[in-house]
């Protein structure tokens, strides 16, 4: 008796699975708030140099005459590229000649300026404080802001490697429980840190634990659910991220101080840590590591919740031992990473699949973590992205079955790329249009994630499928780390980051057209199955009078 049959006995889609889904998907909403947090905690408010005439009461008292604030600002700070007060320069001495009505640009362009030696004055009308205002991450230090975001995303990459190994060794539920605790503790400490490096360190720890939460949530949902209900559970898990974006915008709207916001999104994980001790360990994992007595107890617990106690009474350690013998060995074919890179039928599939994964992570996190560049009301924009993501994820499943994998993958990358490129041409004054294009683009990237997850699983044989998918996820996280850093190109032109964010998904989407279609094809189990599919494709195309170059891919 294999494990799926054991699960059917105790109930693979019953009351327990419903309760487990609620318990596991609820933290996913708050995981999303951690991922998107720095849209708000690292927001850059309007700012200018501190100047004595405006910000020092003694200097103000010595001003001859009665001048308004705008006049004092004009004689203290030169205009910036957008004709607003310059954010990083001030006049060394007040330029009183600028008050004259016949003043031209020459009157101030030759005046001596200097950096903001005495600090900055920030606009607190939207945020009481952010990490930018706390540690002055502007002007010469502006690169530190996207660096903090990249450090967080690097933590997810490291955490995925560490937690993946730990969950295979120590169990899914145990690693999940301690991941909840690490998020809550590290997130709370990050909110109290007095220096920027320490803040980044604890945000890195939060991210590594976030990876553990995401990975082990998916594992427990799948390993305690029947094959028929598995896609539903994965859909609920994906929708948790969508609702989480709405939650992020709502919480940030109500909490405008970055320290309090960091605390607000970290505190719920203490509750998740407490109730996670109730969750059962994966019986499938317990069987594979030979812990049959504990596996039997967990199966009986699930059966009791699903009201199948009579069926559970028929389970014994001997039955579980036979199930352990029937579990497939993941190393049966000796397939390795080199197989993906050196096998002609798999090499190009691997590279293009990784390119699609990279394009998603690079573009999504590059844009989703800088909503200020896409619209004026970032609270509403964050919520709208989550709302649009809901039907997009559901609709992408329908389109995959109708249009096929290859076309859906290509269009779900090309469309957001075109939306991003179009935003270059839209003036900042047209905020509604810019926000609409941004929401459409980021929503389409949600479809791209759904497509690449399914498509990459079908492109590779069973013996090396998880290696290929894991390689793709590494590419996505690598892209996510690089994405925020592209914003540093903005010093050479505000349009340049958007150009890069737009070109990468367009080129990746076009490359996806070189992949073979996998719609309605049986999943390949061996490398020989891939080669047979290629031969059939070539034969079919020759019979039809055309030979596609992608047939060997």
From Swiss-Prot:
Q: What reaction gets catalysed by this protein?
A: urate(out) + (S)-lactate(in) = urate(in) + (S)-lactate(out); nicotinate(in) + urate(out) = nicotinate(out) + urate(in); urate(out) + n chloride(in) = urate(in) + n chloride(out); orotate(out) + nicotinate(in) = orotate(in) + nicotinate(out)
> Which keywords appear in this protein's UniProt record, sorted alphabetically?
Cell membrane, Glycoprotein, Ion transport, Membrane, Phosphoprotein, Transmembrane, Transmembrane helix, Transport
PROSITE patterns reported in the protein's UniProt record: MFS
Organism (species): Rattus norvegicus
- Family according to the record: Belongs to the major facilitator (TC 2.A.1) superfamily. Organic cation transporter (TC 2.A.1.19) family.
Q: What is this protein called?
A: Solute carrier family 22 member 12
Q: What does the record note on quaternary structure?
A: Interacts with PDZK1.
Main localization category: membrane
Q: Which CDD domains match?
A: MFS_OAT
């Amino acid at each position: 008796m294999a494990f799926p049959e054991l699960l059917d006995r105790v109930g693979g889609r019953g009351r327990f699975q419903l309760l487990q889904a609620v318990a596991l998907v609820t933290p996913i909403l708050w995981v999303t708030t951690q991922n998107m947090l720095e849209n708000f905690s690292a927001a850059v408010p309007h700012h200018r140099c501190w100047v004595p005439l405006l910000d020092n009461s003694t200097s103000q008292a010595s001003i001859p005459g009665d001048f308004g604030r705008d006049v004092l600002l004009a004689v203290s700070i030169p205009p910036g590229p957008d004709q607003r007060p310059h954010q990083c320069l001030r006049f060394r001495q007040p330029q009183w000649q600028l008050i004259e009505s016949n003043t031209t640009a020459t009157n101030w362009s030759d005046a001596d300026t200097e950096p903001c030696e005495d600090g900055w004055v920030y606009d607190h009308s939207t945020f009481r404080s952010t990490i930018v205002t706390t540690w002055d991450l502007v002007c010469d230090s502006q690169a530190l802001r996207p660096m903090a975001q990249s450090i967080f995303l690097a933590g997810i990459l490291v955490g995925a490697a560490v937690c993946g190994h730990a969950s295979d060794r120590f169990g899914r539920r145990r690693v999940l429980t301690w991941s909840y605790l690490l998020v809550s503790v590290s997130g709370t400490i990050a909110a109290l840190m007095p220096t920027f490096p320490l803040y980044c360190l604890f945000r890195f720890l939060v991210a590594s634990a976030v990876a553990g939460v995401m990975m082990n949530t998916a594992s427990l949902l799948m390993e305690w659910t029947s094959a028929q209900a598995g896609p539903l559970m994965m859909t609920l898990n994906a929708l948790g991220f969508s609702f989480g974006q709405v939650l992020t915008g709502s919480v940030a709207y109500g909490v405008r101080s970055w320290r309090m916001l960091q605390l607000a999104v970290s505190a719920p994980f203490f509750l998740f840590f407490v109730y996670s001790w109730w969750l059962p360990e994966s019986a499938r994992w317990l069987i594979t590591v030979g812990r049959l007595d504990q596996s039997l107890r967990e199966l009986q617990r699930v059966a009791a919740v699903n009201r199948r106690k009579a069926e559970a009474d028929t389970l014994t350690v001997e039955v579980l031992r036979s199930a352990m013998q029937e579990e497939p060995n993941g190393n049966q074919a000796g397939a390795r990473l080199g197989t993906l890179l050196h096998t002609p039928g798999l090499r190009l599939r691997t590279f293009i699949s990784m390119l699609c994964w990279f394009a998603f992570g690079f573009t999504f996190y590059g844009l989703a973590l800088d909503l200020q560049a896409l619209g004026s009301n970032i609270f509403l924009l964050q919520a709208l992205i989550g709302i649009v993501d809901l039907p997009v994820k559901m609709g992408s499943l329908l389109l995959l079955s109708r249009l096929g994998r290859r076309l859906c993958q290509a269009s779900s990358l090309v469309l957001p790329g075109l939306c991003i490129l179009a935003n270059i041409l839209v003036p900042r004054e047209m905020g509604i249009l810019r926000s609409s294009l941004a929401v459409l683009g980021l929503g389409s990237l949600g479809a791209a994630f759904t497509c690449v997850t399914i498509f990459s699983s079908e492109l590779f044989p069973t013996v090396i499928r998880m290696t290929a998918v894991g390689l793709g996820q590494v590419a996505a996280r690598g892209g996510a780390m690089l994405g925020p850093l592209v914003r540093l190109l903005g010093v050479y032109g505000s349009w340049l980051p958007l150009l890069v964010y737009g070109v990468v998904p367009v080129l990746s989407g076009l490359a996806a057209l070189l992949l073979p279609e996998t719609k309605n094809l049986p999943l390949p189990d061996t490398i020989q199955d891939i080669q047979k599919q290629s031969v059939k494709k070539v034969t079919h195309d020759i019979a039809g009078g055309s030979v596609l170059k992608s047939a060997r891919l």
